[in-house]
UniProtKB/Swiss-Prot annotation:
It comes from Synechococcus sp. (strain CC9902). One of its GO terms (molecular function) is serine-type endopeptidase activity. The active site is at S96 (nucleophile), H121. SUPFAM superfamilies: ClpP/crotonase. It is found in: Cytoplasm. GO terms for cellular component: cytoplasm; endopeptidase Clp complex. Fourteen ClpP subunits assemble into 2 heptameric rings which stack back to back to give a disk-like structure with a central cavity, resembling the structure of eukaryotic proteasomes. This is ATP-dependent Clp protease proteolytic subunit 1. Belongs to the peptidase S14 family. It is an enzyme of class 3 (hydrolase).
Length: 197
């Protein structure tokens, strides 16, 4: 069930689902696995926000176990294509493609809440059928592994051989460790207290 927010204005009350209300504040929330449906929603929201104001940052909050590499790369490419900076924030878990998207935010604007977990690893896949079909799938997985590792190396500043070694198996990090690694830029402890006028 999606929560509804009710706002009052001079013309009466208006109800929004919570995600539509957040979108008005330029906040996109990835709170599920990366699938064709979730990726299409996120890409559409980013394109909408760019059209609405190409100068204002977009905020992508991530709590995701990962998911489809192809769909995640669609989000990644859109993040690189649009004009607004994309600030990424991990809330809970950014694993696999979730961690890749977290790292894909604008450098200097990638962060995590203090008790979140971040995990990188190599792409997963499976194949069945004739030997030639299995080889095609294996070659594709190796290609994707190379692309993802190269992007992680470019975005973290880590040498490619270290990325290859660290992504060979599940590699979990705390937010502080992710800052040291170069996946994110800061850990959010608490919101600054607003001065009361």
């Amino acid at each position: 069930m999606i929560p509804i927010v009710i706002e009052e204005s001079g013309r009466g009350e208006r109800a929004f689902d919570i995600y539509s209300r957040l979108l008005r504040e330029r906040i996109i929330f990835l709170g599920e696995a990366v699938t064709s449906d979730s990726a299409n929603r996120i890409v559409a929201q980013m394109l909408f926000l760019e059209a609405e104001d190409p100068e204002k940052d977009i905020y992508l909050y991530i709590n995701s176990p990962g998911g489809s590499v192809y769909d995640g790369l669609g989000i990644f490419d859109t993040m690189q294509h649009i004009k607004p900076d994309v600030q990424t924030v991990c809330v809970g878990l950014a694993a696999s493609m979730g961690a890749f998207l977290l790292c894909a935010g604008t450098k200097g604007k990638r962060s995590s809440l203090q008790h979140s977990r971040i995990m990188i690893h190599q792409p997963l896949g499976g194949a069945s059928g004739q030997a030639s079909d299995i080889r095609i799938q294996a070659d594709e997985i190796l290609y994707l592994k190379d692309r993802l590792n190269t992007e992680l190396s470019d975005r973290t500043g880590q040498p490619l051989d270290r990325i290859q070694e660290d992504t060979d198996r599940d590699f979990f990090m705390s937010p502080g460790e992710a800052v040291s690694y170069g996946l994110i830029d800061s850990v959010i402890d608490k919101r600054p207290v607003q001065a009361v006028a």
